Amino acid sequence: MSWYKKAKGDDPEYQKMKDWFTKRTDRHINSVQKYCKKLEDYDSKRFKGLIERGEEHDQSKFKDPEIDPYIYVTWSYKCKDDGVDWEPPKGMDDKMNEATTYHVLNNSHHPEFHAGEDSEVINEEDRDDPKRDKIIDGTKMPDIDIAEMVADWVSVGNERGNSAKGWADKNINARWKFTKAQENLIYELIEVCEGS
């Protein structure tokens, strides 16, 4: 174990952040699994295997190179939600952006995975704001990836007190480009998840 990891492991503040990350991420994954099941039950032929995919959802966040930066990403959201003024350590912002880029490029439930691009895939100033000067091409996403993406959006929306429909309205054809058929599918699946 490197001295850096040992020092962080001994830091009670870091341990508190790590515990929150684990609790929040596990809760998110469980929510995604619930919606993956709901969507596979809705159309078991079209979304066969979605339940199993839900079981693997975001597991990469618990491994290098994602885990450490995502502990800070998650803590940053918690502080923002709690109205706490908090800044990550110097140099961590870049690592947080790199980890997010790595995550979206290596997990097929993100449109960026399918776009064939490896730079400028997130807005480094505000990861939740669409990057207006560059739209990511999500038109190659298969339906099962779209279904997992919707399960993810609904879960995050529930966590943040927002709706996946609002997120879709804000981001479709602003952050991510989809075909009309994909767009219709996204809204249909959001309705399946949020409508009942």
Identify the residue ranges that each predicted region occupies.
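Metal-dependent phosphohydrolase cores
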Residues: 1-196
